[in-house]
C-alpha cells in the first residue's frame, strides 16, 4: 500500500517563500510518481493537521528556524510520524553555525576564524577582525542576513540599514577564492560543484534566480582539494548522524591552497534549480523525480526515526 505523504512547507522563518517553492517542486514530483501527496502550510496548528491526516511519512520541505532546527522533527517524533532528512540532534546542531564550527574544528576540519558579536558592538564598530569580514546570522540559511564588508564604506552602509542587524551574529574572516558545494546522498559524497555568482557573493538572488550564477561541475580545483571536500562533507554528515542527504559549503583560496568549511545544511534547497538536485543529476544521472523517490524510500525504511549519530566512533 502506498502511504500518504504530507509535504510540510511554508512555516514561520525568513525562508518561507523558498520553502513553498521546494514544497511545490516536491508535490509535482510526487504526483508524477503516483504518490498520494498532501501539501501542508505549517502553522501553529500543525500537530492537529497531522493527526487528522495521519500520514505514513512527512516530507520536510521547510527551511530555517522551526523547519530545519529540530523543532518540527521533535514534533513528528512525538506524533510517531516518520519523516525525511535529518533528525532532531543533527538538525539542531547543523543550523547553529557556532556549534557546527566547534565540531568542524574538533574533527580537524579547517573553518574561518570568527566569533559571536552583539548588535551593540556591530553598531559601535567594535569588531576585532580586519576588513574584509563576513557578518551573518547564527541560525539562518539561504544567505539571508549575510553581509560581506570589504571596506569602511560597506560598514557605514550596513550601519545605515541597522534594522537588519540581529542581537547576536557571527563575524568571521572573509575567505577569497572559489565557492564550493558538496552533496552527500545515502552516505556517499557524490560530487562537488563550483559556483561563480554574478553578484559579490552567492546571495539569495543568485541562489534562486536562474542565470545569476555560473555552475561548474565538477569543480575546477586541484584533485587533492576536490577529494578533501568529499571527505570533509561525508565525515561531518556521518558524525552528526545526518540522514539521506546533506550539502556542505566550502571556500577554496587558490593563492595559499587552503580549504575552509563554512557550514553543513541538513535541509538544502530543493527545487529543480537547487544545488543538490543538480549535483545528483550531473554526478549520478539521477533526475529530480528519482531523487525525491530515493529520499522517500530511504526515509520509510528506517525503523527507528530517532538520530543515528556516529559520534561514538570519535569518542
From Swiss-Prot:
EC number, UniProt record: 6.3.2.4
Cofactor binding mode and count: Binds 2 magnesium or manganese ions per subunit.
Keywords for this protein: ATP-binding, Cell shape, Cell wall biogenesis/degradation, Cytoplasm, Ligase, Magnesium, Manganese, Metal-binding, Nucleotide-binding, Peptidoglycan synthesis
Residue ranges of domain ATP-grasp in the record: 101-297
InterPro entries: ATP-grasp (IPR011761), ATP_grasp_subdomain_1 (IPR013815), D-Ala_lig_Van_CS (IPR000291), D_ala_D_ala (IPR005905), Dala_Dala_lig_C (IPR011095), Dala_Dala_lig_N (IPR011127), PreATP-grasp_dom_sf (IPR016185)
The protein's required cofactors: Mg(2+); Mn(2+)
Residue positions binding ATP: 128-181
Pathway it works in: Cell wall biogenesis; peptidoglycan biosynthesis
Binding site for Mg(2+) 2: 263, 265
Location in or out of the cell: Cytoplasm
UniProt record, GO biological process: cell wall organization; peptidoglycan biosynthetic process; regulation of cell shape
UniProt-recorded Gene Ontology molecular function terms: ATP binding; D-alanine-D-alanine ligase activity; metal ion binding
GO cellular component: cytoplasm
Pfam families per the UniProt record, alphabetical: Dala_Dala_lig_C, Dala_Dala_lig_N
Primary location class: cytoplasm
Biological role: Cell wall formation.
HAMAP family, alphabetized: Dala_Dala_lig (MF_00047)
Similarity field: Belongs to the D-alanine--D-alanine ligase family.
Protein name: D-alanine--D-alanine ligase
Species in which this protein is naturally found: Wolbachia pipientis wMel
